[in-house]
């Protein structure tokens, strides 16, 4: 059995408390925005990492998703948005970031996220996962559900920012 070492703190070499919030964000929702905003007091910088999943065919290309996320956080110097297509553990190691931020909507999310946190920690022992429960009003939101509702001309104005709703309507209606 491999020897496990004590994880590093969440401080990067620059002394900043940094975290990565990774996802496809196709599209970003108020649930995502809420997790990021509630996590900001704990970190000096959060890197929102637009990732590619081989399992999912995104509605929007990565540069569009990146812009949609950036538009949610204009003026917020503690949020940086990047695109990455490799392993999250490798990105974290390369950028000297030791914390992954994840939002949890329910027990089914926890099961999946626990598996991912364990695998990421096995690939990069300096990496820890910071879980935040979704706020009650966003507990049921997911990007797939939003795309389904809007494709039938439903109202998603309380689920996504206005610029995201506009982009969704342009693409799906």
Predicted regions and their residues:
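Nucleotidyltransferase catalytic core that binds NTPs
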Residues: 1-173
